[in-house]
Amino acid sequence: MPYDPTKIEPKWQAYWAGHHIFRVEIDPARPKFYALDMFPYPSGAGLHVGHPLGYTATDIMCRYKRMRGFNVLHPMGWDSFGLPAERHAMRTGVHPDITTKRNIETFRGQVQRLGFSYDWSREFATTDPAYVRWTQWIFLKLFENGLAYQAEVAVNWCPAQNAVLADEEVKDGRYVETGDPVIRRRMRQWMLRITAYADRLLQGLDGLDWPENLKAMQRNWIGRSEGAEIRFPLEHGKGVITVFTTRPETLFGASYILLAPEHPAVAAIVEPEMSEAVAAYIAEAEGLEETVRADAGREKTGVFTGAYAINPANGARLPVWVADYVLAGYGTGALMAVPAHDARDYAFAHSHELPIIRVIDSEADIEKGAYEGEGAMVNSGFLSGLGSPEARSAIVAWLQANGTGWPKVMYRLRDWLFSRQRYWGEPIPVLHLADGSVMPLPEECLPLLPPELDDYAPTPDGEPPLARAQAWVETIVPGTDIPARRETNTMPQWAGSCWYYLRFLDPENTSEPVGREAERYWMPVDLYVGGAEHAVLHLLYARFWHKVLYDIGVVSTEEPFQRLFNQGMILAHSYRDAAGRYYAPSSVVEEEGRWFAGSVEVQRAVEKMSKSQLNVVNPDDVVHQFGADALRLYEMFMGPLDAAKPWQTAGVIGVRRFLERAWRIVCDESDGLSPVVLEAAPSPQLLRLRHQTVKTVTADIEAIRFNTAVSRLMELANALTAEAARPREVVETFVLLLAPFAPHIAEELWSKLGHGETLTWVSWPTFDPALIEMETREYVVQINGKVRHRFEAAADLGEALLAAARSEPSVMALLDGKTVVKEVLVPGRLVNFVVEDL
C-alpha cells in the first residue's frame, strides 16, 4: 500500500489524544524543558501557513527533548481579547464572546490537524473569567505598590477607532495595526510605572539567550542616557528652567534655551507681545504625533517667548524659545541648545539666526555644520584645554558645588499608557468615589466582567463603551452603602499576554495565579518562539510584569524567557495590475516570463500573506493534499528558521516525495515490513554515515538549524534506498531521527518495525565519535554566477550542500531582500543562487 497520510495522521492524532501522551506533571526526578509559542489571537480568518512555522519549530524541539529524557511542558492557549472581535460586534451585533469562542474552535481544529504535541489539558483563553480574575488581581497588586496611577497626559488618539494607543502602537503617525491616522490629545488615563524598572529591564537583558538585534531594540527603546540636570535662572525673578543634557561640558557653548510646547513654564514666562504667536504655535504642535515632531529630517520650527535665561557658567543671556522637536516626555522637556555641537540645534540656530559658539576644538568647518565629536575644550573658561571626558566631570562637580546642577540618568522609556476606550478587554477593577479618590475593588469581587451592551462603539468624545451601561457603572462600595462608580476604561490586549506563560503551569489553581511548586519547577521558559515584531511590546511588558511579580514573591526568577528565537516570515507571491488590483494566484498564468490574469498583464511580487492581497495559503488545503508531515517538513526545509522565505507549492511536492521514499525504506507493496530490512551489520560506509547523521542532526536541532537537519535525513534516506539489504539498526535510527519533524509517519514506521508502543519516549540515538572522523573540503557559493563566498564543510556533503550554503551567515546576508529564482547545485564543488531583487 502506498504512503497515505489521510489515514495515518488521524490515526496517530487520535492515539496521542486518547492516551494523553503529552499530558505532563511535575517530576522532580527528571530535568524539565518548558517550550512556549507566542499564543495566537484567534481571528476569524483562521491560520495561514505562516502560523505553523514557529509552532513546528517548538514541536520539533519538544519531541526531541522527550526522547532525550526531559519532562516537557508544551502548552497552547488563546490571546482572545482584541479589537477585531469588537469591530465584528459593531458590524453584526454578535457579542465578541460568541465570535471569539467560534474562532477558537476553528483555530484549535487547524492546530490539532498538524500533529503538535501540546498538553491540551492546560488550554485557556485570556477571556476566560477564571483567567480575567488573576489578570485583574495582578493589576490590583500594581495599584497597591504605586505602579498603577491616573494622570492627565498627551495621548495618541485614533479618531477612526475612537481609542487611545500606546506609543509602541504608533509608527509614522499611524496605528500600526490598521494604518489609521493618529493625533495627539490630552486625556486622563491609567498609566503603569514601567520606568521604575528601567535599569533592571536593561540589566536583565545581559543574561538572556536572545537575538542580539532584539536585545538592542529593547536597549534602544529604554534609552538610558547619563548626563546632568542644570538650572538656568530666568531674568526678573520669573523662576528657573531645569534642563537635562548628556553633554554638560558644552555649557559655555549654549546660546539659547528650548522648551517643549507642553512645558508648564511656557505660560508663566511668555511676554505679552509674544503670547498670541506662542499660543498659535503650541496649538499647531499639539496636533502632531511625537515621531513626526522628533523626525531628524524635518524642518526645525519654533517661536520666541520673549523671555531670557541666564547661563550659570558665564552669565550669558540666553533667549528662551518653544520648539516642537523638544518632547515633554523626555528629560525635563527643556534643552540647552549648543548649535556648534548638535546637528538639530545647528539647524534651528541657522534658521532663526541665533549665535553658534564653538567650544570643542576640531578641524570641522563650523560654517558648514555641527561638530558632534569630542576634543579639547575652547572658549570654555576654566574648562578650556581639558579633553571632553575630563571637562564633563569637572563641570558636573562645579555645578554641584554651586548648587546649580547635578548628575542625572534619564531614559527614553516612558510609563506605559495602559487604559483603552474599548469594550472587549478586562475591566479595570477600581471604584471612583464622590470625593475623587480611587479605591481597589476587593479581591473577593473578582473577576469583574464587562456587562452586556447593545452598542459596542466608543463615543467620539473619548467616552468608553462601558459608560453606556449605567446600571453596571453606578454601584456601591462592597459591604457598605457608599455610592461609587466603576472605571469604564478597559485594559489593553497586552495585559492578558503579560503573564499567560505562568498560568500554563497551574491553570486550575483557584487560590493564586500560579502555585509555588509549579512555578519553581517549570520556570523560566526554556525556549520561547515568536515574531520579532513584539520586541518592544509584549516582550518588554511581560518582563516588566514578571519583575513586579518577583518583587511581591509570586515568582522565583527575575526573567521569564531564558531563550528566545524569532522565526522569519513565510511570504507568498502576489499578483497586481497597473491599477493596484490584486488577483488570486490560481487565476494567473505565465507566458514567456510575463504574468497574465486573463488578458490583463500583472506584476508578480513576493509579499507578506494577506487576505487583501489574495495570496493567503490555508494549511488545511496543504494538509488535505499533501499531509501534515509534508507541511511541517517543508516549512523546516525552506531555509533558516529566522529568515524570510517565499512559499513554493512545488517544494511541498518534493518533500512529499521524500516521505514516500521514507515509507518505501521500511514498507513493502503489501503494507508489511520490507523484506530488505534485515538484522544485518551495516557496511563501514553506511555505519559511518549513520553516526555522522546522528551527530549533525542532534547538533542542528539544538542550534535550531532545522533545514540542514532535514537535508541530512534526506542524505541518509538516499543511502538506505540504495542498499540491497537495509540494516535494521540504521533504518530504526533513521525513523527515530525523523520523528520530531514528521511524527505521524515516524510512529507508523516504528510500529511496522515491530514496536508496540509510541516512540515518544524512545531514547534518542547516540553516536560514536571514533566512527565519524569526517573529512572536509572547501565549497564555493556563487550568486548569479559570481563567487561571493567560500566555506569549509564535510567532504561528502552531497545534496545537503544546498542547505549548508544557505545557513552560512554571509550567504544569508547576501540573499537578504532578494528572491531566489533558481538554485544550481554542483555536488562536491559549488552552489549558484540565481536571484532577483524584491
UniProtKB/Swiss-Prot annotation:
<feature type="short sequence motif" description="'KMSKS' region">
    <location>
        <begin position="608"/>
        <end position="612"/>
    </location>
</feature>
<dbReference type="InterPro" id="IPR001412">
    <property type="entry name" value="aa-tRNA-synth_I_CS"/>
</dbReference>
<dbReference type="InterPro" id="IPR002302">
    <property type="entry name" value="Leu-tRNA-ligase"/>
</dbReference>
<dbReference type="InterPro" id="IPR009080">
    <property type="entry name" value="tRNAsynth_Ia_anticodon-bd"/>
</dbReference>
<dbReference type="InterPro" id="IPR009008">
    <property type="entry name" value="Val/Leu/Ile-tRNA-synth_edit"/>
</dbReference>
<keyword id="KW-0067">ATP-binding</keyword>
<dbReference type="InterPro" id="IPR002300">
    <property type="entry name" value="aa-tRNA-synth_Ia"/>
</dbReference>
<dbReference type="InterPro" id="IPR014729">
    <property type="entry name" value="Rossmann-like_a/b/a_fold"/>
</dbReference>
<keyword id="KW-0648">Protein biosynthesis</keyword>
<dbReference type="GO" id="GO:0004823">
    <property type="term" value="F:leucine-tRNA ligase activity"/>
</dbReference>
<dbReference type="GO" id="GO:0002161">
    <property type="term" value="F:aminoacyl-tRNA deacylase activity"/>
</dbReference>
<dbReference type="Pfam" id="PF08264">
    <property type="entry name" value="Anticodon_1"/>
</dbReference>
<comment type="similarity">
    <text>Belongs to the class-I aminoacyl-tRNA synthetase family.</text>
</comment>
<dbReference type="GO" id="GO:0005829">
    <property type="term" value="C:cytosol"/>
</dbReference>
<keyword id="KW-0030">Aminoacyl-tRNA synthetase</keyword>
<dbReference type="Pfam" id="PF09334">
    <property type="entry name" value="tRNA-synt_1g"/>
</dbReference>
<keyword id="KW-0963">Cytoplasm</keyword>
<dbReference type="InterPro" id="IPR025709">
    <property type="entry name" value="Leu_tRNA-synth_edit"/>
</dbReference>
<feature type="binding site">
    <location>
        <position position="611"/>
    </location>
    <ligand>
        <name>ATP</name>
    </ligand>
</feature>
<dbReference type="Pfam" id="PF00133">
    <property type="entry name" value="tRNA-synt_1"/>
</dbReference>
<dbReference type="Pfam" id="PF13603">
    <property type="entry name" value="tRNA-synt_1_2"/>
</dbReference>
<feature type="short sequence motif" description="'HIGH' region">
    <location>
        <begin position="40"/>
        <end position="51"/>
    </location>
</feature>
<dbReference type="InterPro" id="IPR013155">
    <property type="entry name" value="M/V/L/I-tRNA-synth_anticd-bd"/>
</dbReference>
<keyword id="KW-0436">Ligase</keyword>
<protein>
    <recommendedName>
        <fullName>Leucine--tRNA ligase 1</fullName>
        <ecNumber>6.1.1.4</ecNumber>
    </recommendedName>
</protein>
<dbReference type="GO" id="GO:0005524">
    <property type="term" value="F:ATP binding"/>
</dbReference>
<dbReference type="GO" id="GO:0006429">
    <property type="term" value="P:leucyl-tRNA aminoacylation"/>
</dbReference>
<keyword id="KW-0547">Nucleotide-binding</keyword>
<dbReference type="InterPro" id="IPR015413">
    <property type="entry name" value="Methionyl/Leucyl_tRNA_Synth"/>
</dbReference>
